[in-house]
Structures are given as structure tokens and as C-alpha cells.
Amino acid sequence: VPECRYPKQRGKNTIIKLMSRFRTFIRWAIKNKYMSHYPFVEYEMGTAIFGTPYYLTKDERNTLYKAKFPNNPALEVQRDIFIFQSFIGCRIGDLMKMTKTNIINGAIEYIPRKTKEGRPVTVRVPLSPTAKEIIAKYPDVPGNKLLPFISEQKYNKAIKKMIQLAGIDRVVTTINTITREEEKHPIWEVASSHMARRNLIGNLYREVQDPNLIAKIS
């Protein structure tokens, strides 16, 4: 029997993002004379609202890296990948495509997927001692993959579980994407692969406060 899934309610930010893309397409169609009527004349797009970015502090990151999960060794593998991603700051889609060939002269080099169709930019991130240590743990991953990746969905579930089991339960404030109301959650409950990017950017900004430098490696 096919699985029955009901559509989820979309948040205001998601609707704004989708409608913005649709508006861009409509403008292209009008410019190329595929249509003449512009349907967005009286449509108010609205403004996306985001809460304060949350991320693991250096101490929390180190606590997670040292945590042991004797009853779930597979979780320790995914923990290593999450810590590695927290040092590299790349998006999950870019991370999962990395192989050993992305290691060049003590750094990770890659072209972010989001820049490939516009102006391709090569990002170079020096490997920290911890990042090198993690890579050394997994020398023979099938397909020459950089690390033993699993699906993004399973990875996100593993991230929540590992942070919870490590006892990292600091409460953070988020914005509900549907109601736009403020909510409080333990950080493990709202953690995901995208938080790994914020782990790098947030901690780095505390030290250097140089947006240009941070942009070059994220």
C-alpha cells in the first residue's frame, strides 16, 4: 500500500522564498515576450523574519567530540562527520560530494554548489588538527569518499540524538515558521546539518569579526 502523506503547512518565509522565485520567472517571461501581464502589481511579498542564529559554542563542540556512545558506535561516526563539518563550514550537499581529492596541501578545497551556475568560486579551508584527526580515522571509505556519509535525513536525526546524549541541552530562542511566534527549545531539539555552518561562522566571528574573511571560507 503506498504511503499516504499529507501536505505540511508552509511557513511565511518559505512562501516568500517560493513567490520570489516565481516573480523572477514571470519577469523573465515578460522580458522575453512570452507574456505581457505582470500579476505581481498589487501583490505584497512581505518580509522574511529570522530569529537569532544559534550554534554550538567551542566548549559544547569539544564536549560533543569527546562524548562516548558505547551502545551506538554508528552514532560516533556521524558525530565525527558533524564535528568535521563544524570546522569546514560547508553546506551538507557540498560535504557529501567530497572525496579524498578535495584535500589539497593541508586544506579542503571545493566549489560550493550554489556558485557553480553563477560565478564559480573555489573555497579553501585549512584543516585544523581535529579535522585531520577525523579524516585519519576513515582512510578507506568506499568510492574514495572523504567520510562515511549517510542520507541527509538520517544524518539530521543523528545530529539531534548525539547532542542530546552528550548532555548539551542549553535552551535557545527560535521563531516558529508558521506562527512567527517566539519559542524556546533545548538546542539538540532544533539542531541540524545547517547548524554546523553556524558553528564555524558564529565562533569565528566572535574571534575575528571580519565578515570578508568569514565569507571566504564559508
PLM feature spans:
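Catalytic-site neighborhood detector that most strongly recognizes the C-terminal catalytic loop/helix
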Residues: 55, 114-116, 152-155, 218
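Conserved tyrosine-mediated DNA breakage-rejoining catalytic core shared by Y-recombinases
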Residues: 42-50, 88, 97-136
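Short, charged phosphate-coordinating catalytic segments
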Residues: 26-38, 85-107
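Residue-level signal for the short linker/turn that defines the boundary of a DNA-recognition helix
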Residues: 10, 79, 90, 208-209
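Short, basic (Lys/Arg/His-rich) helix/loop patches that form interaction surfaces
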Residues: 70-72, 140-145, 160-216
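Conserved catalytic core of the tyrosine transesterase superfamily
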Residues: 66-83
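Short, leucine-enriched amphipathic alpha-helices that occur as contiguous helical runs
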Residues: 61, 77-79, 156, 194-198, ...
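N-terminal core-binding DNA-recognition domain of tyrosine recombinases/integrases
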Residues: 1-54, 67-71
